[in-house]
Amino acid sequence: CDCTKLETRGTKLVAEGDILFLDSSTTVAHLAEELARSSFTSLTVITNSVAVMQLFRRLPAHYVRIALGGAYDPQLNSFLGETTVAQLAQLNVTKAFLSAFGLDDRNATTNHEHQAELIRKVMASSERNYLLVDRSKFGRTGLYRLSARGAFDEIITDRKA
């Protein structure tokens, strides 16, 4: 994975004052690291990821951090389930940065049922949705559909065109 390319392209899509949702994927965690080093002065970060919250705890107070709680999934190091979805339903998101287990010609997919449910809710509530996937995700298919490929405002990848 050329994650530097992914995180740089992702960071360029962020603007001052954005309300971001960052999912619990390792790909999006690279973007979170880049955002933590950036010069933004006003961002709100919403996440269900324990790793992302730990990263952003060191940021200045002008960053608003919102952690979605719920049932803890140790495999994904994140919170998922009905409580997480209910908390998300109360929030506005301007831009969501998401990843997937696989991306084929039709769909982005995952192997985690509750993660799929949360991502679908995030996409429905966000003004813009970005999928970050490294080249290893192409042609793979998971059990649960996140969304149609065309539902994303942009697919950010390190794959050569």
Each PLM stretch: what is its role?
Residues C1-L80, V85-Q87, L91:
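N-terminal active-site beta-alpha-beta segment that forms phosphate/nucleotide-binding
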Residues V50-A161:
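Conserved phosphate- and dinucleotide-binding cores of soluble alpha/beta proteins
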